[in-house]
């Protein structure tokens, strides 16, 4: 009783009498019940109604005259005669338009069960598909209750003698249905209800003294005794899924809830219960104040007609009374069209319409019953936005009352719906920092925090100096559990001086740049920073060494150089405790790390030498820098032995073949550092023999000048001419070197004698004795050449005379052909045959097979063709000479004409293999052309 009295009472339903429509035409079928002032009068039901039910859009009534009445939503009452005497029980199925009824057609105790198909008509009335006696045996007994399963396969009938019959099969047909006695007892059956759970069907049976359940979907119908007290008629009901389909039994002391196999909770609702219903999550109980034995329900119903009755609507989930009102002589309570309808003995129908959720919530808000409002909203399945609004109002209420701890808990429940800044502004006061911390923690746990929220939360931790909470916040087990922006957290912790926490975040979440910044800029732990870089993957190790390499080189040069060597050769991360190290090694470009070694030449030299040895295919910049470094060391070295060693190293590097493509750069480096041996070596490699010669000339190294000429004179003969000119200008006694040069010039015929004499004439110390031997040898050679030319001329003349005689003989004398063999096949000559004046004879078929022309001898044709080609070439040159002379005379710019002919290769020497008599024509033509060219050029100048 105490618990019941503590339940709050509300008016969540509106009551009004149902009124008749304006007229027969005033309401269309399916229209809402008319209950306003426009109605003419209140609706009045027929008298003598004994039983009621509802479903399929209608209220169904049975009366003492045997009629069944239907009241649809249009409030147009219709009925038909179902029994001859009276109707005692009705059950309207909710999923099928089937009505089951129990009544009497004759006097005595002989109740009949009728099944009506309301969708089919028989003479204007619903079709009765089945009629059978309710009593299974011969002993008369009164039906006390009736229930039907929605699948139409089960129907149970309870009797006052304590028995229960079960109809199994299609209840609408006799031949498909089987009736058997399920239960026998000593107490009247007051309530029945089917409960479906999966494929299992239970039947609850309640009497005045006990509660039981049966499994009717299987064999043997196992029974479970649930309780040893029962209830009166119409004081039991089955709840909806919101209460897990529990069977409700309302006794005078308590209301009990049952599962098929056990008893559930109970509620201390005192008072004599008359009617129990379940409506949309509410328990509806009609009771009266004075206590009457439940057994009197079977003996003296009329004695109750004048009693005052109270209807209470209970919300069992939220533990409040949603409505309570008194009525006179309630016949029954029905639920249809989303409302409750209370039928009273005077024929009136009272409608109880539930208020909308928002109205109910506002009523609770006015009384500051926020917890109850929250529970109500959840039971009414209010959406998350609506719930968040309630949480916010509840939080505001608690905050205004000074209950900040409670307020923040409500604000936490709004996360995801309410803008966080609304809550944060309320708790920014330093005294409420722990509440703000709790809110921000939850915001992060739900992954709804931004960078500003993370910053604020970490600042709260640091102000509270709560290291344990801080560590708990940042030390998550996995990446998926991180509910904050890691980079923001690192920044805040670093700024607050929590370096170890910032390092933990940076290392565990792979923020390598932040980790190195803190180690190098804040903690100055260079060794640890270098170790950390050494265990990173290749790409990240490379980028971080480029970024922080100079700093590390400045403080720990040797260790940094060692890491760079590995990074550029065969890098493998030094990951502790990890067995699956990278299978493929990576290699960085060593040239890109050279700037890191600024102001560290010793480490740079070690790095470059290591790369050149271990990785011969290193970038060219490595070798260029190494050469420059060695030349600098050589130039600044004072110790002779060390300088000699550096000299050898520099020369060795130059001879390594790495500077072929960057010859100019290496040459500039050697010249900048005055490394003469390197300069000369590069000159020689670049075939710059003139520069080598000039170098020795500048340093008056006579023997080296001669050596250069001897070594490279074959490739560049002009070196001897330059050497002769050089020695000729020397006022010193250079006879030995001049003689050596002249010997080579004379042997190779490199210069005309006249030019040699003119060159030596510039030397005032040179005498005729220097070139006497040269001139004598030259004159002797020319004399020999003249003798050979004269001999050749005589031979050409004799040959010419002989040929002329042959030509004359051919013209004047007959030619006798005496050849007996073919000149081609060398077989005996047979007719027909072909003869030529040259003396060759051929078979006709051989001649036709081998000759290119009928007028030419196949044997003489190759030699004749050479002569003809030479003649044509001479004719072309003669024509070209005439054309050249004409253009030269007509042009204002003679030099342009000459240059054009030179460019076209006109003056190139034409070489032909000809007979000796014709050879002398070409030199004369060329000599004449060149002589005319020179003369004309002189006149032009």
Curated annotation (Swiss-Prot):
Biological processes, Gene Ontology terms: autophagy; intracellular protein transport; vesicle-mediated transport
Residues recorded with modification Omega-N-methylarginine: 904
TM region positions: none
Pfam families associated with the record: PEP5_VPS11_N, TPR_PEP5_VPS11, VPS11_C, zf-C3HC4_2
Chain positions of CHCR repeats: 411-561, 572-736
Tagged with keyword Metal-binding: yes
Residues carrying Phosphoserine: 813, 924
Keywords: Acetylation, Autophagy, Coiled coil, Cytoplasmic vesicle, Endosome, Lysosome, Membrane, Metal-binding, Methylation, Nucleotide-binding, Phosphoprotein, Protein transport, Repeat, Transport, Zinc, Zinc-finger
Subcellular location(s) of the protein: Late endosome membrane; Lysosome membrane; Cytoplasmic vesicle; Early endosome
GO cellular component, one term: early endosome
Coiled-coil intervals: 772-813
Zinc finger intervals, RING-type: 822-861
Record-linked Gene3D superfamilies: Tetratricopeptide repeat domain, YVTN repeat-like/Quinoprotein amine dehydrogenase, Zinc/RING finger domain, C3HC4 (zinc finger)
Record PTM N-acetylalanine, positions in chain: 2
Gene Ontology molecular-function annotations: nucleotide binding; zinc ion binding
Bilayer topology term: Peripheral membrane protein
Keyword Zinc-finger: yes
Family label: Belongs to the VPS11 family.
Subunit structure: Core component of at least two putative endosomal tethering complexes, the homotypic fusion and vacuole protein sorting (HOPS) complex and the class C core vacuole/endosome tethering (CORVET) complex. Their common core is composed of the class C Vps proteins VPS11, VPS16, VPS18 and VPS33A, which in HOPS further associates with VPS39 and VPS41 and in CORVET with VPS8 and TGFBRAP1. Interacts with RAB5C. Interacts with TGFBRAP1, MON1B, STX7, STX17, ECPAS, EZR, RDX, MSN. Associates with adaptor protein complex 3 (AP-3) and clathrin:AP-3 complexes. Interacts with PLEKHM1.
Function according to Swiss-Prot or TrEMBL: Plays a role in vesicle-mediated protein trafficking to lysosomal compartments including the endocytic membrane transport and autophagic pathways. Believed to act as a core component of the putative HOPS and CORVET endosomal tethering complexes which are proposed to be involved in the Rab5-to-Rab7 endosome conversion probably implicating MON1A/B, and via binding SNAREs and SNARE complexes to mediate tethering and docking events during SNARE-mediated membrane fusion.
Protein name: Vacuolar protein sorting-associated protein 11 homolog
Organism, scientific name: Mus musculus
